[in-house]
Every structure is written in structure tokens, then in C-alpha cells.
Amino acid sequence: MSNAPILLTPGPLTTSIRTRQAMLVDWGSWDRDFNQLTASVCEQLLAIIDGASSHHCVPLQGSGTFAVEAAIGTLVPRDGKVLVLINGAYGQRLAKICKVLGRTYSTFETAEDQPTTAADVDRLLAEDPAITHVALIHCETSTGILNPLPEIAQVIKRHGKRLIIDAMSSFGALPIDAREIPFEALIAASGKCLEGVPGMGFVFAEKSALAAAEGNAHSLAMDLHDQHAYMAKTGQWRFTPPTHVVAALHEALQQYNEEGGLPARHQRYADNCKTLLDGMAAIGLRSFLPAEIQAPIIVTFHAPTDARYQFKDFYERVKAKGFILYPGKLTQVETFRVGCIGVVGADGMQAAVNAVAEVLREMEVLDI
């Protein structure tokens, strides 16, 4: 494993030896010890948002998108209407989920380098009283842009609407306090800023909203109301849980708390991001976003304009030097992305910058 490349991606990402070792134990899915492990994970997750008094944590097998679909399908009534705020690929995915689920929805899309504003949301809600819910990506992973969650949340509350937050790439690293930011649901997953492995999503659902959601869901497996009710009654998952993923997340959360919790995790990622931005700028590579809206999670860079630059060749050469990057996901310009999260520090980020510089020299890329 010592020769494995460092994953500079938004997840899955590089995990610690301790986290990987936690998966070497097999668990019985109905066993009391595993039930206690699940309960401990949910309790620790709720503590990160100070949400124990207001929200339930409902874990769900699968990727983060499974949990997003479950949240929309469970909490948005079939006669509800969702306003989907879009400035990237994952906002577009929210809209596609609403379409597939048969939920009425409207969209508001800004450019990929433009955050949605509270004023936008205020105007849109005033224009359409049929809207019941607003769905927002906190950190849009396709670029790394940070949308102004606190301001938008207050506007939504003032209009008497309900907020669903996709916090997949921000939860655990960027502060979100359930006592200060009103939301009906917040969705995240095991394999992002918590530095677990992928395979489990979770939804923080407002207690009263979840209680009222019986019968809304389009799916048996993705019914969060039923999932929570069964867990509350038995302590068990309804269907086979990802036991090793839960065990890894439990260990990752222990390390998260040892590191100093959210403030420390945020600071390390912020240091990683600064090292990356400064180093790439010295090479001549330009970041796609201005600093004031750049989250310290993943950074999008403009690709070199030199004809000798080809991403696949660039990717393989950087990988051979020990780092896995991420392709761009923008529609208008060619880019690539570098993650700042996972078990990596500023020294590792500087080594990645050095690898990129070496590869560009090897490829004789001059026009950057």
C-alpha cells in the first residue's frame, strides 16, 4: 500500500492505515455490537452540526446520490414543488432526480463561476408561491464553488419554505450549525471530508418533517421514514448494511475528533488549498474561480493551451509520480481538478505541485 498513489480527488480519497485496518473485522449485521457501532456513528455525525435536538440522522447504503434521491423522494410530498439552484453538474443532477421521481420542479441556473445569491432566491420565491422546497448544493464539486448557504437559508425560512442541502463535499470541513441554519434535510456521505471510505450516505432530517413523511417515498429501499422507524424500533438496518464501511467511518470519526474536529479539519484543508493555489500559480496554471468563492475542497484549473497538452497523457504521467488528479467537469472551457481533501497535508500538496511541474516540462508544454 505504500506505493499507492495519493488521491487528489473529491472522493473516494486517500484514507489512513487505521481506517483501512478497521475494515479487517467482519460484523454480524444484526449483532448488538454492530448496532451500537451504527448508533455511535449517527450520534457523532449529529454532533458535528449540533443537530441532536432538531434532526434525526438516517444512514443509507450506497453513494451520496442514493441519499440525495432518498431525501427528495421521502421529504418532498408528491404534490410539492422544488426550486433547484444550479451552478454546476451536481445541481443539474438534483433537477434530474426531481424529474425521474415525478416531483414538480423549477430551476434557476447561474454560470459555473457565479454563486447563487440570497437576492436571487428571494425574488424566485416571491414570484412562485407554489414552491414548497429549495434544493441547494453547498459546495458544487464540479468547480469547487461555495454557495452562500447561511444567507440563502434565512431567505427560505422567511418565505416559509423548506431547504434541502446537498453538503456532500462540505460536511465535516465547512461549518454548518443546525441551530443557526434552518434546513429540513442535509445530505452527506462517508467518503468525503470525514475521510472514510465510500458506500454509505446519511441524511439529517428534521424530526417533525420526517415524522410527517410516511407514504411519500417512491421506493421501499430509499424510504427514509421507514428506515428511521425501523432503526428506532430495533437498532438495526432494514436491509443488509455496508458493515465494513460503517466500521471504517467509526474509526475515521475517532481520528477526526483526535485531530480537533471541524476547525482542525478545515484548517488543514485550507492550508492544502493555499499551498496548491500558490504552487500552481508559480507554474503559470490559473484557477477557474476567484479566491473569495473557492472552497478549500477541490480546485479547478484551466488546462494549458499548448497543443502538446493532452489530459490523458498528463494524467498518466502525474499518476506515475504518485498522484491521481481529476478531469474537469465544465461545459465551456477545458479544465482539470485537484482535490485538497483526504489524508494529505501541505507537504503532500507541494509534492503534487512539483510533480505537475515536472510533467509539464517532460511534455514540453510551454504555452500555459
Swiss-Prot record:
**Recorded E.C. number(s)?**
2.6.1.37
* Highest taxon above the source species: Bacteria
TM segments?
none
User: What are the record keywords, sorted?
Assistant: Aminotransferase, Pyridoxal phosphate, Pyruvate, Transferase
Give the reactions, separated by semicolons, that this protein catalyses. Answer: (2-aminoethyl)phosphonate + pyruvate = phosphonoacetaldehyde + L-alanine
Supply the InterPro entries for this chain: Aminotrans_V_dom (IPR000192), NH2EtPonate_pyrv_transaminase (IPR012703), PyrdxlP-dep_Trfase (IPR015424), PyrdxlP-dep_Trfase_major (IPR015421), PyrdxlP-dep_Trfase_small (IPR015422), SP_NH2Trfase/AEP_transaminase (IPR024169)
Q: Identify a single GO molecular function assigned to this protein.
A: 2-aminoethylphosphonate-pyruvate transaminase activity
| Residues carrying N6-(pyridoxal phosphate)lysine | K192
Q: What class of enzyme is it?
A: transferase
**Pfam families associated with the record:** Aminotran_5 (PF00266)
Q: What cofactor(s) does the depicted protein rely on?
A: pyridoxal 5'-phosphate
Q: What does this protein do?
A: Involved in phosphonate degradation.
Q: What is this protein called?
A: 2-aminoethylphosphonate--pyruvate transaminase
The scientific name of the source species is: Pseudomonas putida (strain ATCC 47054 / DSM 6125 / CFBP 8728 / NCIMB 11950 / KT2440)
The top of its lineage is:
Bacteria, Pseudomonadati, Pseudomonadota, Gammaproteobacteria, Pseudomonadales
Q: Quick one: which gene encodes this?
A: phnW
